[in-house]
């Protein structure tokens, strides 16, 4: 089960559009994608409402886990999305 702590770096944080992109990428994979602001308080990364409720602004550290089939591929895709500013430019 891959796990990473990663910083939200885009200017608007994990707002509605960014959360929708995150959930869209997570949904492409059959594995579970728990994510949260603390390692013991994880939510379903495939739920738009759960991801938006994290209220993760710019600079927030999030704990990202993947477990199951294609978990490494899912982790790589989600980390790439976050590191590419959710394809929003900054």
From Swiss-Prot:
One of its GO terms (cellular component) is cytoplasm. Transmembrane segments: none annotated. GO terms for biological process: phosphoenolpyruvate-dependent sugar phosphotransferase system. Keywords: Cytoplasm, Phosphotransferase system, Sugar transport, Transport. CDD domains: PTS-HPr_like. It holds the Pfam family PTS-HPr. The active site is at residue 15. PROSITE patterns: PTS_HPR_DOM (PS51350), PTS_HPR_HIS (PS00369), PTS_HPR_SER (PS00589). Residues 1-89 form the HPr domain. General (non sugar-specific) component of the phosphoenolpyruvate-dependent sugar phosphotransferase system (sugar PTS). This major carbohydrate active-transport system catalyzes the phosphorylation of incoming sugar substrates concomitantly with their translocation across the cell membrane. The phosphoryl group from phosphoenolpyruvate (PEP) is transferred to the phosphoryl carrier protein HPr by enzyme I. Phospho-HPr then transfers it to the PTS EIIA domain. Belongs to the HPr family. This is Phosphocarrier protein HPr. It comes from Pseudomonas putida (Arthrobacter siderocapsulatus).
């Amino acid at each position: 089960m891959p796990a990473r702590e990663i910083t939200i770096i885009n200017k608007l944080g994990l707002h509605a559009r960014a959360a929708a992109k995150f959930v869209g990428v997570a949904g492409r994979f059959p594995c579970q994608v728990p994510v949260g602001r603390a390692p013991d308080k994880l939510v379903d990364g495939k739920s738009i409402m759960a991801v938006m409720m994290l209220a993760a602004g710019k600079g927030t550290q999030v704990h990202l886990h993947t477990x199951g089939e294609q978990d490494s591929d899912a982790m790589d895709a989600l980390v790439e999305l976050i590191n590419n500013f959710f394809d929003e430019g900054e």
